[in-house]
Amino acid sequence: MDKIRIIGGGSLNGTIPISGAKNAALPLMIAALLSEEKLVLENVPRLADVALLQRILGNHGVDITVNGKRNGDDPHAGQTMEIDARVIVDTTAPYDLVSRMRASFWVVGPLLARMGEARVSLPGGCAIGTRPVDFHLDALRALGADIDIDAGYVVARAPHGLTGARIVFPKVSVGATHTAIMAAALAKGDTVIENAAREPEIVDLADCLIKMGARIEGAGTSTIEISGVPRLRGARHSVLPDRIETGTYAMATAMTGGDVTLAGARADLLESALDVLRKAGAQIDVNNEGIRVRRNGAGIFPVEVSTAPHPGFPTDLQAQLMALMTRAQGRSRITETIFENRFMHVQELARLGANIHLEGDTAIVEGSDRLKGAPVMATDLRASVSLVIAGLAAEGETMIQRVYHLDRGFERLEEKLSRCGAQIERISG
């Protein structure tokens, strides 16, 4: 099993190209199931989760062609993917594939809307909280689907098609909002989704579907209105830049006291996180090239942050911020409001010398001017990259095990960091 070895203590300086967003690419790939024509996606990141979804879509009979080669540090050099879902040969998404990634459950909406049926295994993925699929299923029921749970599979049927309806989510859910939008796009009549997620990835999905002929208004607000259409056509769409990768490298730069330009990044996608970084002492400059992050000489200031649905501070940057705050000049408080059990990185950060204690859903971080390298183990995607950030600032060697988590969400991480001066390498084993 691969490991990552880091010799910490240096600063990051240079340019890091920001990849296409995984959290946008996955629903966009799934949206191809809604059309008999080709969907061409540009700037698709090369990630384990993307490759797994290619296998899942292939299981349904979807033909996927990947073109384009990486072109140096061009921030728009992600792969181009042609997805042809003209022929659906199977509406079952099996356990052995879906159990490995929760987002793959989202195929249920498009398959049901287009084919009138779907049989999808209950999902797997990161071990952070329960993430129930109830909101997805309630939305599909509201649109007229019959839903049964049989031997670990969701069996959804709508032999006469779906019908527009009012969907009210009791709690904001990004995944369920994706499902509702895709299913409603082909439903008969009008659908109103209330308490919808407002994340940029929701907007990106809606923008792509509109290019395909969908009639959607309000994406990016809490109320989305959709007028169903009989069919969707093919389209070409570029995946938006990854705001979580952007925030991660911005925090790594602040942690090490460097000067890095995040090429291709969009500040409007993560304003809350950038505001927190400014409060922590980082200098943030936005220009035509992307976002420049600096912290030269000044200390790191403690902050108090609660995660929240967009436009609040993203839960997917909580672990990275905690790593940064281990070096702050004082006490920080970080409250997790989105997922339960998302503090599994605390114990591993403590192995590097971090002083963190938990009070319910809040982590109290006592900053220190010293971390020391040690062997640590990644527990999930975001926790693993928080250990990378801490390792970059720690004295001596940090060895991170179970780095397959990183490959799910960060493209060429070691290469991008090493080009900015980090002493980081992958050790195969």
Curated annotation (Swiss-Prot):
<keyword id="KW-0573">Peptidoglycan synthesis</keyword>
<dbReference type="GO" id="GO:0005737">
    <property type="term" value="C:cytoplasm"/>
</dbReference>
<dbReference type="GO" id="GO:0071555">
    <property type="term" value="P:cell wall organization"/>
</dbReference>
<keyword id="KW-0132">Cell division</keyword>
<dbReference type="InterPro" id="IPR050068">
    <property type="entry name" value="MurA_subfamily"/>
</dbReference>
<keyword id="KW-0808">Transferase</keyword>
<dbReference type="GO" id="GO:0008360">
    <property type="term" value="P:regulation of cell shape"/>
</dbReference>
<feature type="active site" description="Proton donor">
    <location>
        <position position="126"/>
    </location>
</feature>
<dbReference type="GO" id="GO:0051301">
    <property type="term" value="P:cell division"/>
</dbReference>
<dbReference type="GO" id="GO:0009252">
    <property type="term" value="P:peptidoglycan biosynthetic process"/>
</dbReference>
<dbReference type="GO" id="GO:0019277">
    <property type="term" value="P:UDP-N-acetylgalactosamine biosynthetic process"/>
</dbReference>
<keyword id="KW-0133">Cell shape</keyword>
<keyword id="KW-0670">Pyruvate</keyword>
<protein>
    <recommendedName>
        <fullName>UDP-N-acetylglucosamine 1-carboxyvinyltransferase</fullName>
        <ecNumber>2.5.1.7</ecNumber>
    </recommendedName>
</protein>
<dbReference type="Pfam" id="PF00275">
    <property type="entry name" value="EPSP_synthase"/>
</dbReference>
<dbReference type="InterPro" id="IPR036968">
    <property type="entry name" value="Enolpyruvate_Tfrase_sf"/>
</dbReference>
<dbReference type="InterPro" id="IPR005750">
    <property type="entry name" value="UDP_GlcNAc_COvinyl_MurA"/>
</dbReference>
<keyword id="KW-0961">Cell wall biogenesis/degradation</keyword>
<keyword id="KW-0963">Cytoplasm</keyword>
<feature type="binding site">
    <location>
        <position position="316"/>
    </location>
    <ligand>
        <name>UDP-N-acetyl-alpha-D-glucosamine</name>
    </ligand>
</feature>
<keyword id="KW-0131">Cell cycle</keyword>
<comment type="function">
    <text>Cell wall formation. Adds enolpyruvyl to UDP-N-acetylglucosamine.</text>
</comment>
<feature type="binding site">
    <location>
        <begin position="22"/>
        <end position="23"/>
    </location>
    <ligand>
        <name>phosphoenolpyruvate</name>
    </ligand>
</feature>
<feature type="modified residue" description="2-(S-cysteinyl)pyruvic acid O-phosphothioketal">
    <location>
        <position position="126"/>
    </location>
</feature>
<feature type="binding site">
    <location>
        <begin position="171"/>
        <end position="174"/>
    </location>
    <ligand>
        <name>UDP-N-acetyl-alpha-D-glucosamine</name>
    </ligand>
</feature>
<dbReference type="InterPro" id="IPR013792">
    <property type="entry name" value="RNA3'P_cycl/enolpyr_Trfase_a/b"/>
</dbReference>
<feature type="binding site">
    <location>
        <position position="102"/>
    </location>
    <ligand>
        <name>UDP-N-acetyl-alpha-D-glucosamine</name>
    </ligand>
</feature>
<comment type="pathway">
    <text>Cell wall biogenesis; peptidoglycan biosynthesis.</text>
</comment>
<comment type="similarity">
    <text>Belongs to the EPSP synthase family. MurA subfamily.</text>
</comment>
<dbReference type="InterPro" id="IPR001986">
    <property type="entry name" value="Enolpyruvate_Tfrase_dom"/>
</dbReference>
<dbReference type="GO" id="GO:0008760">
    <property type="term" value="F:UDP-N-acetylglucosamine 1-carboxyvinyltransferase activity"/>
</dbReference>
<feature type="binding site">
    <location>
        <position position="338"/>
    </location>
    <ligand>
        <name>UDP-N-acetyl-alpha-D-glucosamine</name>
    </ligand>
</feature>
